[in-house]
Amino acid sequence: MNLQAQPKAQNKRKRCLFGGQEPAPKEQPPPLQPPQQSIRVKEEQYLGHEGPGGAVSTSQPVELPPPSSLALLNSVVYGPERTSAAMLSQQVASVKWPNSVMAPGRGPERGGGGGVSDSSWQQQPGQPPPHSTWNCHSLSLYSATKGSPHPGVGVPTYYNHPEALKREKAGGPQLDRYVRPMMPQKVQLEVGRPQAPLNSFHAAKKPPNQSLPLQPFQLAFGHQVNRQVFRQGPPPPNPVAAFPPQKQQQQQQPQQQQQQQQAALPQMPLFENFYSMPQQPSQQPQDFGLQPAGPLGQSHLAHHSMAPYPFPPNPDMNPELRKALLQDSAPQPALPQVQIPFPRRSRRLSKEGILPPSALDGAGTQPGQEATGNLFLHHWPLQQPPPGSLGQPHPEALGFPLELRESQLLPDGERLAPNGREREAPAMGSEEGMRAVSTGDCGQVLRGGVIQSTRRRRRASQEANLLTLAQKAVELASLQNAKDGSGSEEKRKSVLASTTKCGVEFSEPSLATKRAREDSGMVPLIIPVSVPVRTVDPTEAAQAGGLDEDGKGPEQNPAEHKPSVIVTRRRSTRIPGTDAQAQAEDMNVKLEGEPSVRKPKQRPRPEPLIIPTKAGTFIAPPVYSNITPYQSHLRSPVRLADHPSERSFELPPYTPPPILSPVREGSGLYFNAIISTSTIPAPPPITPKSAHRTLLRTNSAEVTPPVLSVMGEATPVSIEPRINVGSRFQAEIPLMRDRALAAADPHKADLVWQPWEDLESSREKQRQVEDLLTAACSSIFPGAGTNQELALHCLHESRGDILETLNKLLLKKPLRPHNHPLATYHYTGSDQWKMAERKLFNKGIAIYKKDFFLVQKLIQTKTVAQCVEFYYTYKKQVKIGRNGTLTFGDVDTSDEKSAQEEVEVDIKTSQKFPRVPLPRRESPSEERLEPKREVKEPRKEGEEEVPEIQEKEEQEEGRERSRRAAAVKATQTLQANESASDILILRSHESNAPGSAGGQASEKPREGTGKSRRALPFSEKKKKTETFSKTQNQENTFPCKKCGR
């Protein structure tokens, strides 16, 4: 059949149609003639089984099988390249669709792309019987031996004959021009009816009460003449290739002649039948034996000697299949069947390439049905012909040498596969494209490999890539196998099988998948979108060939069927033949090289919750059969049977089951209960880390779930859900009382601050408070000099008494008892930092920036929180050296030069009070040290700290006196004192800044001191004025970090 592609002038992509759409006539290319011939070829093969009896007149109407076999028809659309001759040859009979599902839109969209407008379709008189097209789907698919359909059956070789090919090429375009103008839309729609006879054949063949499934693969994928899909073996590219040479040649001589004659005959009477013939509603039982040919030139069938071939018993054959085969030989009336709507095709199903469930249900699920209607669903064991008839497949049977047939797969991109129709590959962008190449005999490799019923158009480039891969794979396969195919018969068979490189996984699914489908009762969907295709190695093919002659097919080793690439394209448009080869090549490159199968993503699902309903009645699901019944420890452990007559007995409170699974990983809710109630000496094991995986996903008896139940035999058990009713479960409601009594209740909160009445109105009191806060920021207080917050708290506790507040602040013992709510309260900035700690802090900040964890590791004597607090306390008073170094807090100022180089940066809220200019200016370091020391005292509140604080205070007092005595020499004195002192205490000079403002104020005096140090050598007065003016100016502005202005 290796026909060269007919180049078409118009490269317009064909629109795929669904439903009742009727395409414009110009978009309905006439189909090629090869499919019809292939149909007849297979028909003859099948008729060989039946015998010549009971020929049916061409005018007898035939009713199609139910929609179950129709689902595959709706995707069949001829590519634009198909010639009118093929379309004409397939105008077998006009038949009425019995079901609305098979009506116009769903009808075979083959030739015209549209459906048949009639609600039912019947064969028209004068037209060839529809069974001729159906036979291509029948037993030639399954029952033939590995290499041969049946020894006694001759197969017409019209499509393989060179002259016929030439005539086809010459006549195609002319017929196209001749036919198109006179074809109305309805006729063009009915051009697709050649597949209706296919359905009608099975409908007539099947016994009553059988629902025949669609011929799943070939119908939707189109007719491929020379391909055979053998369930039991790799299909040879030419059906006659495996025939015994003598009989093949003898029977094929008249076939070739008649087919050549028919090719030359004009095909136009078919359309006259469409126009004039009334449709006959009557339906008659038909025997699909040999019959005289109709106007389409099926007369060549009559010349074939079609001896009935008995089916030898095969142990591997399903009894239903054997019975079906026996029944096929007897004529049976075709009965209309209940319409079974087909489920919508899904992409996943299409990847798996399984039959539509309804199609399989037609044969498998209905009681009266047998395997005849279900041919595609069963793996047919090979029917062994008489041993004498078996011979090597004759390569020259069709007049083509084996090498020539193989070479026809390869040349100039016009042949996609031995079937010679590269157009099919464009039609099937997915694996069906490959399958169409490789599916073998039943000529119709489900023509619409990709769902052709979509209206959306895909880019030509996408299809070009896919189909190029497909053709490439076929060519590579044939080339590789041609080298091995010159030897023995097995090698030759392997060549024939591997030329279909993609294999016929659809025809030969693994045993596991077949059993799963049959057992589940769910009929697999066959979706001509993307079918997994397996690659066939020549060695496997040879082995399979050897097995097939013994009646054992490759099903014996299903594990070797490795699926190849699955192309999940759902939509495809026909592409001119020029692009087809490149696309097929690219696609087959994938198929050859990488058998990667795209796996759908599996979404993680939560572990199943397994909680028993009742003790003893819990039956673990079979999937989790190794999980033992579990009694929740939180549910009521009561056995009602133990207390049958006790009316006073009360059930314990019912605790609902846990939300989480008892076998989840971790200790869970039951660990404590197990430990507490366990009478076993050793505590039961906790649920292992991966318990939920091992327990819930394995069925091995080795995995033992943790023993969570520790209740003995005598433990009463009651886990019946119930509502806890009774006085035990009621809340105690106090008696109603007068609301006025609430005022007398002591408040449970601690009163921290409450301003007295005349504070806002009395200016004198406000001035006193301000003075107190100013003093709190000075070094006169041994403790708490760093923060105004402490002063305010003391003032509150003293009920506004300023003198009492000063006394509290001057005390060297803890301000509050240990049980006071503020006893452990930390006042910001009250930490005491030694000079060494400050140096380390500045060093750490310079190295690690604000990574206080590393800074704390460097200091080691302060916590991370204290480091953070120190940083933000002095952040706004950082001293920036001329080299850009930042200095936080007071460091060793013994180096006069470094002190002069520092520039003070004052915080905007800090204030220096003119009332106490000298202390602030002359002894800033002491003031800083003092506040910190004082703050540390209240925070620690320890008596042991008092001596240390006292020493510090004495030292600082001495320093202050000396500095005040000689103001001009204060800088030197300060430096000496600072170097001598180990502890520096932060001091805040801010009077109005609450909270951390005190700490910031303490920084300010420090900075003021630095300035004074720098300015004192010149004049004390100059430094005072500079400091005050700078402080007042910067009070409400952000200072410049470089110049301090």
UniProtKB/Swiss-Prot annotation:
Location in chain, cross-link Glycyl lysine isopeptide (Lys-Gly) (interchain with G-Cter in SUMO1): 590
Phosphoprotein is among the record's keywords: yes
Modified sites of kind Asymmetric dimethylarginine: 193
Cysteine disulfide partners in this protein: none
Entry's Gene Ontology molecular function annotations: DNA binding; transcription corepressor activity
Positions bearing Omega-N-methylarginine: 447
GO cellular-component term (any): nucleoplasm
Low complexity biased stretches: 240-264
Composition bias, Acidic residues: 943-957
Subcellular location(s) of the protein: Nucleus
Quaternary state and interactors: Interacts with DNTTIP1. Identified in a histone deacetylase complex that contains DNTTIP1, HDAC1 and MIDEAS; this complex assembles into a tetramer that contains four copies of each protein chain.
Name listed for the protein in its UniProt record: Mitotic deacetylase-associated SANT domain protein
Species this chain originates from: Homo sapiens
